[in-house]
Swiss-Prot record:
Keywords: Cell membrane, Cell projection, Disulfide bond, Membrane, Neurogenesis, Secreted, Signal, Transmembrane, Transmembrane helix. It is found in: Cell membrane; Cell projection, Dendrite; Secreted. In the embryo, expressed in the excretory cell and, during dendrite formation, in the non-neuronal cells surrounding the sensory neurons, including hypodermal cells. Monomer under reducing conditions. Homodimer under non-reducing conditions. May also form higher order oligomers. This is Protein dyf-7. Gene3D superfamilies: Zona pellucida, ZP-C domain (2.60.40.4100). One of its GO terms (cellular component) is dendrite membrane. It holds the Pfam family Zona_pellucida. The keyword Disulfide bond applies. Residues 1-24 form the signal peptide. Disulfide bonds join C211-C273. It comes from Caenorhabditis elegans. The gene is dyf-7.
Amino acid sequence: MNQLWRASCLQVLITFLLIHQNKASEKDRFVELVDCIADSFTVVLNKSDPEVMRMISNPKSQPVVYVYGHKTRHPCGTSMKDEKGLTNFNLTIPYGSECDVTLTDLPKHRYAETTVVLEDNADLSFGKTTRLNHVFCLYTRNVKTIRFSDVSNGHEVIASTGGKPKPKVEMLFRSTDSGKTLQAARENEFVEFFIALSPDSAYHGISPKECTFSDREDISAPDAKKITFVQGGCPVNGMNDIIDPLANVNDQIYFSKFRTFRFGNQSTVFVHCQVQVCLKKDECSKTCYKKVSDSNLTAERLRFRHKRSITDLERRTTRSAPTDDNGSLDLTNSLTVVSRIESAELVASPISQPTIVDTPSEQRRDPCPKSSNMGFIPLIIMGSLASLLLFSAGAAIYFGCKLKSMKKKDSFDMMSAFSNPTVSMPVTYSHYQRSAYNASVDSLYR
């Protein structure tokens, strides 16, 4: 009973110490994140850290952050405040002997680490606070990808407080005629094959290490059939009847062309590739791959064409499964190879009509009738409008001419009236023009 009690007390004590240690480590950490690029990494300080906030707000403080042991070297340290009051929370540490930060090669990764120091230069007391924070970067060396159409990253799950950039590697198949991305192809037809890296600030080159055709999603199955066309980082000789040797564009894109085939009667073919990812292009450069220097092919153009070509295609569901204890995932997709007989049957078979299920009358909607003469209706309307326009113009011309002739007939010519002696001009007087003088004058003519 006493032993059980002692064990319980010891377990509670260990749990308390672990919790206290984790809280202390979180409290002591003043680095928010680490941004890893190819030739250096940038340490970003936590702006909400109480000590950092206190030194920034104190006008007399002079906070600095630097690589441990290299305070006097300019590239290895920086001041967080300048004379103008501007603040800086970033420290970029280059790789090399200058700051004694080097990349260490591991079987699956590259590793760089150091320790940064945060202190106040204005504090000259003996017991001033100096804080240390361990930082590191972890770079993936190999990427296992089996997928045709999407970006596949290294999925290794490693507990860390540093940075771990993920390379973007894409594998896809395209038609040799239209250049569209393929999910199915006919047997014995040529298909283009691409492996492309989208270069970023960390990764600038790739190199295929091993690529295999297989009839199984799980390539490690005992009865899986395999055809390896890249092995040991170079194309396998004697595979020209199936696939051409991979060619290299700028150490970032590898492409080839192969003739589709089937494993027996199985129409699904899987492609497995393991790719080495490099921080510099020359690290992945190999002479066994044919280099194409005059090509304008880039990963961005490949991705643009791929996205444009798959908009009308049904996206296949991604299947993933863990492959090792580190938790890395292999993404799987398949290429359907249709035989000549199956292709002929698909062409000859009638198009199946969808079955119409009877629905209640209030929910059933009859489709709008489509007449075969729907295309002639606009022509008929246009002809009628043109005829009406011509008729209106003719009527307007006819009535205009007739009105003009009537005006000429009823008009009065003053010169012809005075020159013709037989014409009598009656003179009328208004009521207001009749006067005594006018009456006497009028009587003379009667």
